[in-house]
Amino acid sequence: MASSHSSSPVPQGSSSDVFFKKEVDPTKHIRPVQSLPDVCPKEPTGDSHTLCVAPSLVTDQHRWTVYHSKVNLPAALNDPTLAKRESDFFTKTWGLDFVDTEVIPSLYLPQISKENFIAYQQEISQREKIHERCKNICPPKDTFDRTLLHIHDKSRTDLEQVPKIFMKPDFALDDSLTFNSVLPWSHFNTAGGKGSRDAASSKLLQEKLSHYLDIVEVNIAHQISLRSEAFFHAMTSQHELQDYLKKTTQAVKMLRDKIAQIDKVMCEGSLQILRLALTRNNCVKVYNKLKLMATVHQTQPTVQVLLSTSEFVGALDLIATTQEVLQQELQGIHSFRHLGSQLCELEKLIDKMMIAEFSTYSHSDLNRPLEGECQVLEEERLVSLVFGLLKQRKLNFLEIYGEEMIITAKNIIKERVINKVSQIEEIDTDVVVKLADQMRMLNFPQWIDLLKDIFSKFTVFLQRVKATLNIIHSVVLSVLEKSQRTRELEEIPQQRSAGKDSSLDTDVAYLTHEGWFISDAFSEGEPASAAVDTTSQRNTSPHSEPCSSDSVSEPECTTDSSSSKEQTSACAPPGGIEIIVSEDMRLTDLELGKLASNIQELLCNASDVCHDRAVKFLMSRAKDGFLEKLNSTEFIALSRLMETFIVDTEQICGRKSTSLLGALQSQANKFVNRFHEERRTKLSLLLDNERWKQADVPAEFQDLVDSIADGKIALPEKKPVVTEERKPADVLVVEGHQYAVVGTVLLLIRIILEYCQCVDNIPSVTTDMLTRLTDLLKYFNSRSCQLVLGAGALQVVGLKTITTKNLALSSRCLQLIVHYIPVIRAHFEARLPPKQWSMLRHFDHITKDYHDHIAEISAKLVAIMDSLFDKLLSKYEVKAPVPSPCFRNICKQMTKMHEAIFDLLPEEQTQMLFLRINASYKLHLKKQLSHLNVINDGGPQNGLVTADVAFYTGNLQALKGLKDLDLNMAEIWEQKR
């Protein structure tokens, strides 16, 4: 059968010895070995099989196969299509030594011989002999297996004849579908004429079912015959088992009788003693319970007494202890069924009393007269209140204190204003009713004194708030420290109890008829030392009554919960009062840490409140533009006062408040804008009225410049009038250099120093002042350029013309400002934070603009002479007399130019200017000579020109400061090519 080839129920041969050969059954199906295809296939002969084996050029042309001669060395060597074998296939490419070279054996591989297997053969020979002997004794398994396989296949074939519906586990004839499948009534017809056929079909169906039954019975009989030995063995074992059970029941009955006798003789008396001990302990418990009830009954009167003395913490501890006893020890006592709710209401009442008490304390503490030392009011009372509020988790008491702070800050300003106004007789309070209007009637000295008084009161107020909050903060930290220490102590007993529980779990507990465990009786009778250990950890309220003097009932006086949870200890806060920190006060570390941070935040809020009230006070005074009308001295005094208050509050609170600082910055910005506009307007008026003539330099300006040279960038202090007055100088001497300047520049230097001094007095406006100062310097540069170079002064001032002297004077003024720009830059750089140093680039831009302006003025002076040379030399003729009128006129104009600028400009600049003028002169002269065809040939015309040039050179070098000037007049002649 086909199934016999797929699986075999009997193992084929033994696999116990892997070293022995197995006999292979020749009848078994062996898969034929497929030979590799021939390298050189035969020519197709029409056989289909041959065609299938051979490669296909169509299908295999893109797939690599062994038929590719490119990669198949044997195919390349044995190719029959070649005309001849190439014997020198390798040698012709790789040399003659390629074929004859022998492969050297590996040094790491040993030589294996038969001697290496001798030890293995000796070891295995004995086992091989035993195996051969056993194989001869035992019958061959192949025959047995073949027989069983044949029988199995036959029975399986018979069973396959039975329909599958009979083999289903849910086979039931009461199912209509199953019944119709087994008995197909559709084949039977009760109508006449077909009765004989129906009878035959019925008979045939009955025979078929009988045949199926026979097959099943034969298979069942066969299976029973195969397992008959196991059935007989089971029946025999059943009889033996019944005999064993009968003997066992008899032995158990005898054992029970003996145990009953032993129990009666040896155990009943001892158990009776234990029962009596349990009864006695129960009586003691009832007695202690009654005493505890008597103590609890006195709770409410005791709480009333404690509240009358403001002992909130003690009353709360007593209520908490009583609540714990009611929930554990006295649970279910009918007479105390309402006591728990009464204590809860009493606890809520205490909460309200503590909050009201804290509010009263806050009002009393913050509204004390702001004189004297900053001591805490009734420190012990504060500590007691804070502990009570923490115990009840009433953490909003800081909000009450914060609200009281706001009210107090408002009252401080109101009281100070009323006090100040009442001292001034000029203010009629009956006419001016509003307090703000009365305050606005104060002049600046009176108002600044009032502000100073308010700031001093605010400072004392903040110091008192800080002292009070420090006490609260220390209480919170003590509770936090105690909580952490208690948690560490609780972890140690838990670790010990874990070890004890593991040993107690193995003990045997005997249950009596009363439902008690004997182990309970032993635990009740533990030595007194253990009881003392437990009571030593308990701590009741100091106002609770003692339990009893009975030593027997002492361990039962307090509850188990008090011994396990209410471990309290006395802590000493800064107030000196000892407050008990109970387990009930179990705020988490997160809550306590948050509360501590809120306390610090409340102190900062107090500072913010003071700053906010001060800002409102300033704004109410600034409504009529009072602050904007302050001069520099007054505003600096106000700014310093406000900055001092900001620093003082920052030292107290540890954080800088921004509201007053912002108000100061806002007023400072307004002051800076007004300050700058005033000076810009002043500079504009000075420039519009400047006639650009050299001005005398008063002695005070020379002193101002000298102080700048000494490193003091500030306006000099006003000195008393001296009878001896110094005469003004012609020029301004700056570090040994003389500067001829106009009056506007002198005042501009003073204005610049005012900007620098304002930065020193008000550091917060440094950046704004830098921007405004650069704007002022740019304005001076651009406006002076418009007036002088652009000839705007002709219309503004009414000058007839812009002379070379005006130009030189303007250039020298610009040079003076350029000289002081690095000094100003260094002054601002020292006062700017490093991150704002980028703003200093404005000074570099201004310096470049000034240098460009100076260069334009120099170019303008050269252009004036250039136009003169062009006009005069264009009419020049080479003829007598010598020197010619043209050259006389040129020398005259050069002398005037020198006289105009020499006393104004430095000698080096004058020389550079005349070198440029001389270059322009040579260019025009060369052009005219070229036009006249005068060359350097030594002729008469050349002599005349040489004489004129010598006259020009002599006159120019005779001018002051131009003696050593290299004129290089040979350049006027055309170079010969």
UniProtKB/Swiss-Prot annotation:
Major localisation: Golgi
Protein name: Vacuolar protein sorting-associated protein 54
Annotated region (Disordered), positions in chain: 528-573
PANTHER family: VACUOLAR PROTEIN SORTING 54, VACUOLAR PROTEIN SORTING-ASSOCIATED PROTEIN 54
UniProt xrefs under Pfam families: Vps54, Vps54_N
Summary of the function given for this chain in its UniProt record: Acts as a component of the GARP complex that is involved in retrograde transport from early and late endosomes to the trans-Golgi network (TGN). The GARP complex is required for the maintenance of the cycling of mannose 6-phosphate receptors between the TGN and endosomes, this cycling is necessary for proper lysosomal sorting of acid hydrolases such as CTSD. Within the GARP complex, required to tether the complex to the TGN. Not involved in endocytic recycling.
Family, as annotated: Belongs to the VPS54 family.
Record's disease association: Defects in Vps54 are the cause of wobbler phenotype (wr). Wr is autosomal recessive and is a spontaneous mutation discovered almost 50 years ago. It causes spinal muscular atrophy and defective spermiogenesis.
GO terms for cellular component: cytoplasm; cytosol; GARP complex; membrane; mitochondrion; nucleoplasm; perinuclear region of cytoplasm; synapse
InterPro entries hit by this protein: Vps54, Vps54_C, VPS54_N
Subcellular location, record wording: Golgi apparatus, trans-Golgi network; Membrane
Entry superkingdom: Eukaryota
Coiled-coil residues: 239-261
Start-end of Polar residues biased regions: 532-570
One of the GO BP terms on file: astrocyte differentiation
Assigned keywords, A-Z: Coiled coil, Disease variant, Golgi apparatus, Membrane, Phosphoprotein, Protein transport, Transport
Subunit annotation: Component of the Golgi-associated retrograde protein (GARP) complex, also called VFT (VPS fifty-three) complex, composed of VPS51, VPS52, VPS53 and VPS54. EIPR1 interacts with GARP complex and mediates its recruitment to the trans-Golgi network. Interacts with VPS51 in an EIPR1-independent manner.
Organism, as annotated: Mus musculus
Outcome of swapping L967Q: In wr; destabilizes and consequently reduces protein levels, as well as those of the GARP complex
Residue numbers carrying Phosphoserine: S8
